């Protein structure tokens, strides 16, 4: 509880952006509305002193993390428009979108805690009893956090900082939506972001490839083969064409063997603003179909930055495409985030989200190092789904 009081007190003295920087995260240069957050949430999973490689261990850590996260969400809910404008360095706030996201996130957080608590025992400090509503959960979460064991107080402070920073990331996206579209919300029932994946089930996805021959795309695919995992690779048409010009379709078929490939558009441009966005999609889909076996190609499109037009649903339906977003972002493209940051961030978010679609980029080398560590730490606690199942998401 003292962290809530401390954090709220800091807001009366400092701008939110400065306050967030004081709680175990980093400050980055101010960025444009359409790019990334000015602050990236970081965590240190080494402060959690239990194994998370079994279902019971994962659920225990998930319950504890969700107790902290729920209170941080409640705290951040109190931010005024003026505080958000100053902290997020944006020009306007869509309060309706913010409130919609908060309601949804509180609901998901409650559901995730209920799932994590299915086999709770009274003696466990993370088990706060029956919580049928969000209000019940928030009241009991405060009591539960007060019982944090002494040896986990440093962990609690760290996760509190992470949670405030992560909620700030999401509030920023919600505040901008739909003026700047993103993964934070959906326009129609032909879009999904991973929130409806089953409990403790996760999908891997990679954007922006392929790289040149023997580049990080090849390294990433070799890693997945060694780990017996599959992923969906959302490729840029111009990168695929460039790679094809230096090899052939047979080589690319071998490269993506046992994996899935889908469209990221022809160029990495906002498909909400680009007047050639439809051609970008049809051109890329034509190249995919001409290059790779039908079984490898999924009828999915992932818009760069998650940006697409609010009225694009009819077009995607005419192309038999679903818009495939994500709900767990590694931020691996960010130069201020290293492999250790990614590993800790993704595990923490998996404990909070408990299911979904993980976003990485195979044009950067960090994921190929971070993922084997994540696989080892989680072991059999979660299920990594076959990439072909992503085509069935709704």
For the regions a language model picked out, list residue spans one by one.
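Metal-dependent polysaccharide deacetylase catalytic core of the NodB/CE4 family, i.e.
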Residues: 133-157, 162-165, 200-202, 212-214, ...
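Terminal accessory/targeting
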Residues: 2-203, 215, 222-231, 354-394
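Short, flexible, glycine/charge-rich loop motifs used to bind or transfer phosphoryl groups or to couple energy/partner
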Residues: 192-194, 251, 291, 346-349
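A short, acidic, amphipathic alpha-helical segment used as a generic capping/interface helix at domain edges
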Residues: 339-351
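Short amphipathic alpha-helix initiation/capping segments at coil-to-helix junctions
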Residues: 335, 339, 364-367
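Alpha-helix C-terminal capping segments
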Residues: 255-256, 349-350, 378
């Amino acid at each position: 509880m003292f962290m809530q009081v401390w954090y709220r007190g800091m807001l009366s003295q400092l701008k939110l952006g400065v306050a967030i920087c004081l709680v175990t995260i980093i400050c980055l240069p101010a960025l444009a509305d359409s790019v990334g957050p000015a602050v990236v949430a970081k965590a240190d999973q080494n402060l959690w002193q239990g194994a998370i490689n079994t279902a019971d261990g994962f659920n225990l850590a998930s319950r504890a993390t969700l107790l902290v996260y729920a209170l941080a969400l409640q705290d951040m809910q109190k931010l005024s428009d003026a505080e958000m404008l100053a902290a997020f360095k944006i020009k306007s706030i869509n309060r309706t979108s913010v409130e919609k996201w908060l309601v949804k996130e509180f609901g998901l957080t409650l559901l995730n805690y209920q799932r994590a608590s299915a086999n709770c025992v009274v003696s466990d400090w993370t088990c706060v009893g029956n919580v049928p509503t969000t209000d019940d959960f928030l009241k009991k979460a405060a009591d539960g956090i007060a019982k944090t064991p002494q040896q986990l107080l440093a962990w609690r402070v760290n996760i509190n900082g992470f949670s405030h920073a992560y909620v700030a990331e999401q509030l920023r996206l919600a505040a901008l939506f739909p003026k700047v579209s993103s993964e934070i919300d959906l326009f129609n029932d032909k879009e999904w972001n991973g929130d409806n994946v089953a409990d403790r089930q996760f999908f891997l996805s990679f954007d922006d490839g392929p790289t040149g021959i023997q580049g990080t795309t090849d390294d990433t695919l070799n890693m997945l083969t060694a780990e017996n995992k599959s992923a969906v690779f959302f490729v840029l048409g111009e990168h695929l064409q460039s790679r094809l010009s230096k090899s052939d379709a047979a080589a690319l078929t071998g490269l993506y063997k046992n994996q899935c490939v889908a469209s990221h558009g022809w160029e990495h441009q906002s498909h909400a603003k680009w007047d050639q966005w439809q051609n970008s999609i049809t051109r890329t889909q034509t190249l995919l179909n001409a290059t790779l076996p039908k079984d490898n190609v999924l009828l999915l499109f992932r818009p760069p930055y998650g940006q697409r037009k609010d009225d694009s649903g009819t077009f995607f339906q005419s192309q038999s495409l679903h818009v495939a977003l994500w709900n767990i972002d590694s931020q691996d493209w960010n130069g201020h985030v290293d492999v250790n940051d990614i590993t800790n961030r993704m595990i923490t978010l998996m404990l909070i989200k408990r299911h979904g679609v993980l976003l990485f980029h195979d044009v950067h080398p960090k994921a190929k190092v971070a993922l084997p560590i994540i696989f080892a730490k989680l072991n059999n606690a979660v299920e990594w789904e076959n990439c072909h199942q992503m085509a069935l998401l709704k």
